[in-house]
């Protein structure tokens, strides 16, 4: 016979959501001292663990750098197609915020928190894209290097108050 009792964790989550006027996503930052130290790899490993727990995980944007380990981890995750923008005559992939909001996964991976978005983007900086995802109730995993922190102190403050 099925257990018809309510799950206390789900009840508590519903109460908190109602009290806050809606669920705000959680942010997890994979922090490193420089490029190539394994932030994206660690983020992808954590995403696989979340997927294994039944979380709806989508890759919003990953800077691939053609690393075989990164490519292998990407192969078993859903990857949203990037927006193609033209920069100095070249096609450049950009994170598709609109596509991510439309897809509305439980968890989205968006590499490079300190990235400056293309001119025709909704926001100037990727951290603003991430803030919008969080407000939409989507959990976000992202990466950042230490050299970007000093210049983004104000943004980090805004994100942790979201």
Where are these regions (language model features)?
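Conserved phosphate-handling catalytic cores of large alpha/beta enzymes
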Residues: 148-162
């Amino acid at each position: 016979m099925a257990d018809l009792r309510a799950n206390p964790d789900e009840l508590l989550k519903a109460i908190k959501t109602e009290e806050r006027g809606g669920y705000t996503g959680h942010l997890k930052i994979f922090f490193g001292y420089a490029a190539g130290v394994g932030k994206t790899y660690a983020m992808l490993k954590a995403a696989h663990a979340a997927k294994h727990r039944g979380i709806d995980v989508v890759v919003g944007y990953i800077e691939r750098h053609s690393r075989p380990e990164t490519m292998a981890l990407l192969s078993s995750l859903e990857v949203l197609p990037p927006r193609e923008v033209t920069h100095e005559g070249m096609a450049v992939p950009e994170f598709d915020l609109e596509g991510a909001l439309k897809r509305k996964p439980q968890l989205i991976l968006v590499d490079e928190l300190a990235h400056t978005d293309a001119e025709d983007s909704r926001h100037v900086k990727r951290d603003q894209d991430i803030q919008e995802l969080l407000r939409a109730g989507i959990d976000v995993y992202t990466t950042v290097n230490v050299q970007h922190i000093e210049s983004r102190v104000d943004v980090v403050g805004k994100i942790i108050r979201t």
